[in-house]
Amino acid sequence: MNAPKTVTVKTALIVAGPTCSGKSALALDLARCFEGTVINADSMQVYRDLHILTARPHAADEAAVPHRLYGVLDAAVPGSVAWWRSEALREMDVAWAEERMPILCGGTGMYLRALTDGLVEVPDPGDAARSEARGLAEEIGPEALHARLMQVDPETASGLRPNDTQRISRAWEVWTGTGHGLAWWRSQPGLPPASCRFVSVQLDPEREGLRRAIDSRFGQMLEAGALEEVSALLERGLDPVLPAMRAHGVPELAAVLRGEVPLEEARKSAVLAIGRYTRRQATWFRHHALGKGDDGMISLRRYTHSAQESESQYEKIENFISERVDAAARAS
């Protein structure tokens, strides 16, 4: 790897892609190369209660280069796009002040797009609306609540999967608490994009290799104490609708701890659910560019630290970024 490269132009890197594609490893290597600060852009890795199941970077990696917005929220606090955007912008400013490159790393596309394209702010619908939405989701189920939402806010409901409890509950609370649907709010003028240049790298590995990696990693999570992590979370008696309680692996392992299913069955269910989620992630990223013009590249391989193939892949990515950073410096 080449000597660290100091970046003085207001540029930020984005490392995006589906779960288990190697984003954290790539971001770490890029941070070493470009004197970067890695900023979490994963909606589940913000929770301090879920270090293992969300595959947060290891302590040694976090010590090697600055890592920000990892494990900063309690599981009882629901994160939001608006909250993350504000925190990410603050961390980006800190990185630039320290003459470091902000490297936004994660698979939550809506978080990243809130920086690259801006964000419409939705007013807080209030505790009463939230309680009503969660109560209905538990009482009648997500599909019935989705049907109700379709009657009052078809524009929003038509874009949601009928079994997506979290998003349906959110849409219902916004409609009841503000008098307008999410789709309406998103059509209004909002916050502008971040005032910097983004250079993005999207990892899009082939499906079969990704599936094997997901299965292997979930096994490693179990060995590392994922069951104990979920047990500690359940002991807190938190609302099951909270995002942290719905993180991949939490519902499945909770069922094991309640004696409802054997561990192997739960493992298979979790791996399948994660696989389906990565397909949705990959589809989303294919339809939403995170860099303008030629400031984005797609790598069709999973990234690891050690493989010779990844070393060649890394050199291509580093050269791609260096060319665009140098061009920005010349233009400034």
From Swiss-Prot:
Molecular function in Gene Ontology: ATP binding; tRNA dimethylallyltransferase activity
Keyword presence, tRNA processing: yes
Cofactor: Mg(2+)
Residues binding substrate, per UniProt: T19, C20, S21, G22, K23, S24
EC number from the UniProt entry: 2.5.1.75
Catalytic activity annotation: adenosine(37) in tRNA + dimethylallyl diphosphate = N(6)-dimethylallyladenosine(37) in tRNA + diphosphate
InterPro entries: Dimethylallyltransferase, IPT, P-loop_NTPase
Region (Interaction with substrate tRNA): 42-45, 166-170
Binding sites annotated in the UniProt record for ATP: G17, P18, T19, C20, S21, G22, K23, S24
Interaction with substrate tRNA, annotated site positions: T108, R130
An individual GO BP term: tRNA modification
Quaternary structure and partners: Monomer.
Function: Catalyzes the transfer of a dimethylallyl group onto the adenine at position 37 in tRNAs that read codons beginning with uridine, leading to the formation of N6-(dimethylallyl)adenosine (i(6)A).
Family: Belongs to the IPP transferase family.
Name of the protein this chain belongs to: tRNA dimethylallyltransferase
Organism: Gluconobacter oxydans (strain 621H) (Gluconobacter suboxydans)
Name of the gene encoding the protein in the UniProt record: miaA
